[in-house]
Amino acid sequence: VDIAILLHDHYDVKIDFEKDSAVLSADPRIVKEELEYIQCLSYNEAKLAGMFGMKILDPIAIKEIDDNNLDIPIVITEMVKPDGNVTMIKKNPPVLEHANPIKIVTGKRNCAMVRMESTASSHLVASLQLDRQYHDFVKLSPYVIDDTEMTRLLFLDADYVRRHERYIRAYYPQTEIVYGRGVVTLIGDEMWRVPKIASTASSTVSEHDLNILNLDAQEETSRILIVVEDKGTSVADAVRAIHSTRTKIHGLK
C-alpha cells in the first residue's frame, strides 16, 4: 500500500492481493450455507469488516490511502481461481441494483465495554487516537443517568484494556469496565435504505435464545452493532442466525 501511494502520482496504480478466497458475506469457518461472493466494497465497508473480525485487509492500510485523499483500487483475487471470483475495493464503488445492502455479517470475540462520563471519554479518545495511535474501539450512543451524560466505548481487544486499566481509569476514577463481551456487526453503506433492519436483526438473535446486551445502529456509520455475552459459541451462533435471514431482510427493501 505504501508503495502504491508513492507511485500514484506517476502511474495508474492498482493493488492486487491474492488470497484463498475473494470476500464472502461471512467468515466461511463460521457460516457454511448461503454464502455470497461480494463483488464490490467501499473503503469504509472494508475498514469496518477488518475492525470487526473479517480478515480482508488491515484497516490501517485503507486508512493510509484515505489520509492521503487517494482512490486506489484494491482487488482481492481468489488464488485457486484467478479468473474466477474477485472483489473490488474502491472509495466509492458502484451501487449494484440487485445487491444485498447487508454486505457482510461478522463477529468479534474478546471485547470489553468501558463506561465513563462523556467529557472524560472525549479526552481518553483523543489521547488514544492522537498520542497512542490506537483505533481499535468504537464510541457507542451516549445515555444520561442522574443528569450526567455517560459514554460507552466498545474496545475490540479486551487484552489491551486489561493491560491499560490504570491509564483508562486515570481519566475517570468511577469508570466501569466489563469484560466477556462479543459483538456481531452488520456492514453495508446502503443498509439505511432497508426499513426495520435493526429490529429484524435483533429479533432474529433473540429468537435463538441469545441475550442482546446492547444494540447500536447509526445511519452515518454503515454498521449495526449487536453486543452479546462472549460465552461458548454465542458470537458464532448470532452470526449464523443473522446471516441466515440476510436474504429475508433484503426483501424488506
Indicate where each model-derived feature is located.
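C-terminal catalytic "cap/lid" subdomain
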Residues: V1-K253
